[in-house]
Design a protein with these regions (language model features):
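Receiver (REC) domain active-site loop signature in two-component systems and cognate sites
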Residues: 61
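Conserved phosphotransfer cores of two-component systems
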Residues: 48-50, 73-82, 102
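Non-catalytic signal-transmission and effector/linker regions of two-component phosphorelay proteins
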Residues: 1-9, 113-138
Length: 138
C-alpha cells in the first residue's frame, strides 16, 4: 500500500507500444505514477529497481510472456502477486485458461472499459488516485 500523499506506482507490461502508452497516459491522468515495459525481461529489471503498487501485464509477448513473468515474480517478488493483473487480447486462446484459473488474478480482456481498469488498479493498489483525492478534498 502506498503511503498517504504519495502517488501509487503502476508498471504496464505490453509489447504493443501504442496500447502500453495509452494505458500509461490514462492512468497518469488519474494521478498514478506509471512506467512501461515491452516484455517480461524488462519488467523484471524495472521491478528490481523500483517498488510498484500494481503490475499490469499482457499475456502474449516476446522474450518472456505474461505466464513466465508471473512465475518469475512468484519466485523473486512474491509480495507483488497480490497486486498483479493481466490485460490481454487472448481470451480465445485456451492455452492460458488453465493458468489464469490457477493463479486467480484479475484479467481484463482487450478492448476493455477504462473505468473497470481504474477500479481494479485502485482496488489492487489500495490507494485513491491523486486526481480523485484532490477533487474529493482528501
Amino acid at each position: 500500500m502506498t503511503p498517504q500523499g504519495e502517488r501509487a506506482r503502476v508498471l504496464v507490461v505490453d509489447d504493443e507500444k501504442v496500447i502500453a502508452q495509452l494505458i500509461a497516459d490514462m492512468l497518469s491522468g488519474e494521478g498514478y505514477d506509471v512506467d512501461t515495459a515491452p516484455d517480461g525481461v524488462v519488467a523484471l529489471a524495472r521491478l528490481a529497481e523500483r517498488r510498484y503498487d500494481v503490475v499490469l501485464s499482457d499475456l502474449r509477448m516476446p522474450e518472456l510472456d505474461g505466464l513466465g513473468l508471473f512465475r518469475e515474480i512468484e519466485a523473486r517478488h512474491p509480495e507483488v502477486l497480490r497486486r498483479f493483473m493481466f490485460i490481454t487480447g487472448t481470451s480465445e486462446h485456451t492455452d492460458y485458461h488453465g493458468f489464469i484459473d490457477e493463479v486467480r488474478v484479475p484479467v481484463l480482456t482487450k478492448p476493455f472499459d477504462m473505468m473497470e481498469l481504474f477500479r481494479l488498479v485502485q482496488e489492487l493498489s489500495g490507494a485513491q488516485p491523486v486526481a480523485t483525492a484532490a477533487l474529493s478534498g482528501a
